[in-house]
Regions:
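Extended, non-catalytic substrate-recognition/exosite surfaces adjacent to catalytic cores, especially
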Residues: 1-145, 156-157, 169, 182, ...
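Generic alpha-helical secondary structure signal
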Residues: 4, 166, 190-191
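Membrane-targeting and insertion segments and their boundary/processing signals
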Residues: 87-88, 163-166, 170, 196-200
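Peptidoglycan glycan-strand catalytic modules in the bacterial/periplasmic cell-wall system
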Residues: 94, 162-165, 172-177, 184-188, ...
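Sec-exported extracytoplasmic/periplasmic mature domains
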Residues: 122-127, 139, 173-177, 185-189, ...
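Mid-domain, small-residue-enriched loop/turn segments at the edges of structured enzyme/sensor domains
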Residues: 148-156, 160, 187-224
Length: 224
């Protein structure tokens, strides 16, 4: 990351911290609050290498924020498809030190996990079958179509085009962006959004072609 981006991340974390909010409520000035973030103090922090997953240390609150930013935040939710029963729910590393549930609170761009909705809409609306074939070649949707402000020409993840004909089954299994672009062009964004809503994601989603490769953000709970 560039220094400017790191500084933005740190500033956002400082201002959203309990310390900042608490001192603001007490009427402390911004100068006083920032000074308190630079004062060393005893604290207990999360530690992977400890049996208790904790260690006692001395650091500034600012250093503690920087320390916690080094941990990868992830989440997992496992559900039994036949019943909908939740079998596992892991919202983070350690709730005592990371009181944030990434399953339901943390949203991220869904990326290729959104592609099955595009394929489902094409199969439902256009009566395609998994055995139908489309070419893996450069494909553009012109400006003005489907509400596009400018031409949309997605590339495959490797930046290459094989020129081969792929079945929908193969294209989805291998996450071929060019085939997904052709499908959303043919079926249109609206039926894709409708099928997403019908499957339980009842939220506003922009009806634009780029949702096929997903610019929208969802949490793990939404996607299950």
């Amino acid at each position: 990351l560039e220094t400017e981006e790191i500084n933005r991340i740190m500033e956002r974390a400082i201002r959203s911290s309990d310390r900042w909010r608490s001192m603001k409520r007490e009427g402390k000035s911004e100068e006083q609050i920032r000074a308190s973030f630079k004062e060393k103090r005893e604290m207990t922090v999360f530690d992977w290498n400890s049996d208790t997953q904790e260690k006692d240390t001395i650091m500034t609150p600012l250093d503690s924020i920087r320390y916690y930013k080094t941990f990868l935040r992830s989440a997992m939710m496992s559900m039994e498809p036949q019943t909908g029963h939740v079998k596992a729910w892991v919202g983070g590393l350690n709730y005592k030190h990371f009181q944030y549930d990434n399953v339901i609170q943390g949203s991220r761009q869904a990326g290729s996990t959104f592609k099955p909705f595009v394929y489902a809409a094409a199969i439902d609306q256009l009566r395609y079958s998994p055995c139908d074939e489309l070419p893996d070649s450069q494909y553009c949707i012109e400006a003005g179509k489907h509400g596009n402000m400018e031409p949309w020409c997605p590339k495959n993840s490797n930046g290459k085009y094989s020129g081969q004909m792929y079945t929908l089954k193969h294209a989805l299994a291998n996450s071929v962006n060019t085939v997904t672009a052709q499908l959303i062009d043919r079926v249109g964004p609206k039926p894709v959004v409708q099928i997403v809503n019908d499957l339980g994601l009842t939220r506003d989603i922009l009806e634009v072609t780029s949702i096929a490769l997903v610019t929208e953000e969802f949490n793990v709970y939404d996607m299950l």
